[in-house]
Every structure is written in structure tokens, then in C-alpha cells.
Amino acid sequence: NNSVQIEVPQGEYTFRVWCDYVEEGSDSDKYYNTSDFSEIILADRENHSGSNDFRDAFRGSVKATVSAIKNEATVQMRRPMGKFKFISTDLEVFVADAVRKMSDKNQAFDKLLQSINFNDYYVVFRYAAFMPCSFNMFTDKPADSWTNMSFRSMMTIGGENLTTMGFDYIFVNGKETTLSIMLEVYDKDGEKISSTNPINVPIVRSKMTVVKGKFLTSMAS
């Protein structure tokens, strides 16, 4: 919760509010350019910041009458975007393949897992067609899209040997949109070791879509 005091002449108003993350102690834009409420746009097209929870943002509006006495208005903030996350279910197969040249292949899975440096691998997400890049506060809809977009992500190992490959926040037109997304995995030498065909991912405003599959060992046809 946050309160802001402003002075405006008496009258009827619509107050529109945008909220996102910036550097501590700064009021300068970081992830979004917010100078124009008809097109709040991602700040960096060349180095898209995916797999970053600081990309989360909220918007809201309220109509209010301002009179001569003290007035208060409460704005209900909601996300203008949805989130997707890719989780791979084939970690054991991936680990077995990664250590196939080891002399002792009969080690317990936990020991094999410890022998692999997952920082030696990275994931690339590619948007096959387009990616919404800006949002119109007045229409409550995305304003524009970019093509040929991608971002790089690191893998994280979770419970039950599930591997989070990456995630992103996407502006949503209305309640739901669908994007075509491809995923690729590379080793430290830049060699592609797995890839997928385009996957149609439904993205719902203010919700997270989880996509599960064998992304560590698949190869696009």
C-alpha cells in the first residue's frame, strides 16, 4: 500500500496509476519507459530482460470528484500482464547423457547431479512471431509488438528434479492471449544441445501459465 498527496483544482477526474520497480533511491525508469501513458514501453529491445521478477508491474484507475475539502480516492492495482514459466521434466536423462563419458556411470543420481555445473549451460527463449512490447493505460490494452525477440535464461533445479528453464511477463490484450515460443539449450561453448518446435502458450492476465515438457533433451524437427 502507498499514499500520495497531490493538489488539483476542483472537478471530476480520472486518476491513472502505473507501478513498477526501479533502483532503490531512484525515480528514474528502469524496465519500462513510462513518459507516455498511451504507450508504456519496454526500455530495452536489444537486451530483453526475461526471467526477471523485477519486470512485474501494476496498473489501475479510479474516477473521483475533487471538492474544496480534503478528498481521498483508492486505486485498485492489477497486473496488465500474465506470466509464463517453462519447466523441464527430463533432468535424469539429461544428467545421464552429460556424464556418459565418466568412468563410473553407476554412481547414485545425487552424486552425478553434483558433478555437473549447471552454470555451464544456458537457455534461449525465442518468440516465433511477435511479443507485445508496450501498454496503453487509456485503453487498458497492449499498444504495440516487436518481432525477432529473444532472451537468455539460466536453469534452476527445483524439487522432484524439476528444472525451471525460464519465464517472462507478457502484456495481455483483454483477458488472454497466445504466443508462439521456442526454447533452446546451449553449453558453455555455444553448442546447441536441445531445442523445441514453436509451442503455443496461452497467457492469462494476472495469472501464470506453466509449460512442462522434456526441454533438456528434445530436438526440434
Where does each model-flagged region fall?
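Tryptophan-paired
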Residues: 1-29, 96-207
